[in-house]
């Protein structure tokens, strides 16, 4: 009797089906993990910018004016290299001031999800103001404070 070696078509199809099931479970979990890690990076950049603005405020007593008498703006964020997340490579968040919200007494920074991260429908926008209030939204509208569920969920993860 001849001893055959190899796989039958049925064994191959079962293996492919099992791999398909594993991939269908693993990929969404990975994408969710990657989106959450990019959220963390965006929040860190917002807080870094806020620290720089606050250090400047201690000198000038004016959020809008820098120590060299120039005005703080979205262009300044670009000069600092903090206008996108990450600062090099594929952009996941665009950092800017909300509708030129910066003035002498305050500001609101926003991180808007772009590119691949725009698929993260739960936390499309992060906001941070001069008082350290952390907000998030699924739209470009700044929430009223940080007590809403979206803000609490997005800043916690």
Which ranges hold each PLM region?
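Generic N-terminal initiation segments characterized by hydrophobic and/or small/turn-forming residues
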Residues: 6-9, 43, 79
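Residues at secondary-structure transition points
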Residues: 4, 36-40, 44, 102, ...
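Conserved hydrophobic beta-strand within the GNAT/NAT acetyltransferase core sheet
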Residues: 9-12, 53, 111
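N-terminal single-pass transmembrane signal-anchor helix
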Residues: 1-34
């Amino acid at each position: 009797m001849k001893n055959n070696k190899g796989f039958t078509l049925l064994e191959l199809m079962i293996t492919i089906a099992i791999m398909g099931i594993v991939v269908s479970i693993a990929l969404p979990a990975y994408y969710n993990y990657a989106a959450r890690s990019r959220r963390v990076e965006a929040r860190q950049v917002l807080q870094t910018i806020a620290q720089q603005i606050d250090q400047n405020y201690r000198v000038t007593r004016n959020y809008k004016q820098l120590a060299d008498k120039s005005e703080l703006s979205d262009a300044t964020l670009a000069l600092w290299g903090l206008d996108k997340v990450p600062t090099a490579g594929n952009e996941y968040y665009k950092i800017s001031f909300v509708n030129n919200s910066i003035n002498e007494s305050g500001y609101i920074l926003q991180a808007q999800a772009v590119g691949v991260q725009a698929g993260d429908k739960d936390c499309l926008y992060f906001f941070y103001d001069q008082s350290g209030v952390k907000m998030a939204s699924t739209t470009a509208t700044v929430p009223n404070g940080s007590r809403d569920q979206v803000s609490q969920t997005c800043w916690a993860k």
